[in-house]
Amino acid sequence: MSTVNVLRYSALGLGLFFGFRNDMILKCNAKKKEEQAQYEEKLKLVEEAKKEYAKLHPVVTPKDVPANASFNLEDPNIDFERVILNAVESLKEAST
């Protein structure tokens, strides 16, 4: 009779242990899933805010300067990218 009781209580203990473990795993997975959903919602709101900001504050691009325009290289606000690109364009036009 004692062996039967040992087996019975051992099975009960194992059942409680695995039940508790399974419950904790399920709760942890549910919590992670909820946090991921909240994070995705925040990302969605950030993207919407970026789109709205882009609508309210459009990017102003400087107008293209003709290739034959002269530049003041002493100007502290000179756009070197534009100067170089215009020089390359003028060289392309001259070679064709």
UniProtKB/Swiss-Prot annotation:
GO biological-process terms attached to the record: cristae formation; protein-containing complex assembly; proton motive force-driven ATP synthesis
InterPro entries documented for this protein: ATP_synth_F0_esu_mt (IPR008386)
Pfam family, one: ATP-synt_E
Main location: mitochondrion
Keywords: Acetylation, ATP synthesis, CF(0), Hydrogen ion transport, Ion transport, Membrane, Mitochondrion, Mitochondrion inner membrane, Transport
One cellular-component annotation, GO: mitochondrial inner membrane
Gene Ontology molecular functions: proton transmembrane transporter activity; structural molecule activity
Cellular compartment(s): Mitochondrion; Mitochondrion inner membrane
Misc. comment: Present with 4590 molecules/cell in log phase SD medium.
Family designation: Belongs to the ATPase e subunit family.
Job of this protein: Mitochondrial membrane ATP synthase (F(1)F(0) ATP synthase or Complex V) produces ATP from ADP in the presence of a proton gradient across the membrane which is generated by electron transport complexes of the respiratory chain. F-type ATPases consist of two structural domains, F(1) - containing the extramembraneous catalytic core, and F(0) - containing the membrane proton channel, linked together by a central stalk and a peripheral stalk. During catalysis, ATP synthesis in the catalytic domain of F(1) is coupled via a rotary mechanism of the central stalk subunits to proton translocation.
Name of protein: ATP synthase subunit e, mitochondrial
Source organism of this protein record: Saccharomyces cerevisiae (strain ATCC 204508 / S288c) (Baker's yeast)
